[in-house]
């Protein structure tokens, strides 16, 4: 068997190899738009149970695989999953999202953080990733993921989702030393978590800095980029050839800066035209994205046209097709099926 037949398509594209077609997966491809997931959620209402009980997390991760055969199967988890292992417990309330009862507001709390040992605090990750690898074999690429330091710090400091990030920005601009100390600790823990996911079987890992798009470019350079880079540098020192993706929501203002983090692939959201993203990131940077998730509410002809447009603009090297954000609740499952089907046959439409 040749190397290309042995190695999954998305992994080859992530490594920068020439591939026979553009690989495709979707952020949040396992989730609430699928009836099979909603039925399981009725039975197991706790999000943490669904994501930390290996049998449930494996079943959920594989739901879109069985339905649509995407080129990437991402483990069902949450970016906050490692926080309890750092001494920051959280819960996820269905209608409210994540809640952290004792948000981090002082240097004393930062100093009291627990040393993070992923094998000890997250043993279920090994089971989930290992089983996913066995289940999909070489037919798909298994993706892991982590939250980036700024975004995890934002949750831990705000205590919940925020519209204006006033509490973390207050700390950033009035007590920057406390925030830098916290970000450094998170970066080191997340680097260890990435390495652990690699050792457990992940083949590509995406780092979500979901809230970094809320920073001005100069503050991104101060509070987000150095800690993204710290994670990447630590991982690359141990696993230099492992493909890493960086995703930021609302990243138009910091796109070039994302490329400076050291990642292999920049995941572009839909607020940037893919042709512009290619130009701004340079010919050597691989890209992922970037169809507006709302497109999947449109007609199938409309969906097909947007797929063709994105693939044309991205070109035939170093592109992983994806949405510019997670698939939206209420998206018709048949349109998701059509999306994957069309993506896999897109070469015949070009």
Curated annotation (Swiss-Prot):
Under Pfam families, the record lists:
URO-D
Q: Which reaction does it catalyse?
A: uroporphyrinogen III + 4 H(+) = coproporphyrinogen III + 4 CO2
Q: Which UniProt keywords apply?
A: Cytoplasm, Decarboxylase, Lyase, Porphyrin biosynthesis
Q: Which GO terms describe its molecular function?
A: uroporphyrinogen decarboxylase activity
**Cellular compartments annotated:** Cytoplasm
Its function, per the record, reads:
Catalyzes the decarboxylation of four acetate groups of uroporphyrinogen-III to yield coproporphyrinogen-III.
| Record protein name field | Uroporphyrinogen decarboxylase
